[in-house]
Structure formats: C-alpha cells, structure tokens
Amino acid sequence: MGAAYFIVLERKIDGLDTSMDGKSLSRHIESLDEAARRLGVRPLSEFFSVDPKQAADFMEGEGMHVGDLELPPLQQFTAEDGLATVRALSAHSAAQADGVAQDLSACERILSAAAMDGVGWHFEVDL
C-alpha cells in the first residue's frame, strides 16, 4: 500500500473535491525536495503539519509515552506558497517520475481553488 501525502484545507470549499492519490509524492519526496531547493522554492515536506492532539494519539497508539512532550502547533500555509512550489516542480524533470506529475496536478487544482477562496492548507501523511 504505502504512505501518501494529501492536502488538508483550513476549511471546506463548497464543490471542491480534495481527493488525490499522493503516493508518488511520498515515494519521491526526497528528490522533489532536492529539486525544490535547487529551484529556490520551499520543499514540499516543509508544508507538512499535524494537529498536536492527533500526533499524541498516534504516538500513544504506537506504544510511545508522550507525557510532557511539547508538540508543535498545527501550521497552516498560504495556497500561494504551495502553488509556487508545485508549479516550479511541475516544470522540472523530477515531475517525470512515476505518478508525480498527476499528484502535482491534483495539488495545483486544490491549491488554486484554495488561493481563490483565501483558504490555508497543510500536508498530512496517510500511513
């Protein structure tokens, strides 16, 4: 099966389907991040964030003791920042890897709608 990156919007946008595969992004994240750095845009993995309560629940479910561990707050990013990265990567040879272009296209579709509505977002990973 494998991990998959997916976009979580700050709030729902009526009529927008936010579903995407995201597995290719997950499989190729290191090379995509390297390409983003060379292109002078923010790496995709830096848009990852998770609600601290969800993170704590996951960690406890994996047998880890969270205790007084202070987890970082959930971060939302502007759609415009995400679009800059997605568009730069779409034009790069790194997008030619298996399925990456389709995942980037889905990101661009979702983030374009988010930008029009002024909605923040972040990536989460489905394991």
Region locations from a protein language model:
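Acidic (Asp/Glu-rich) sequence patches and key acidic residues
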Residues: 1-119, 125-127
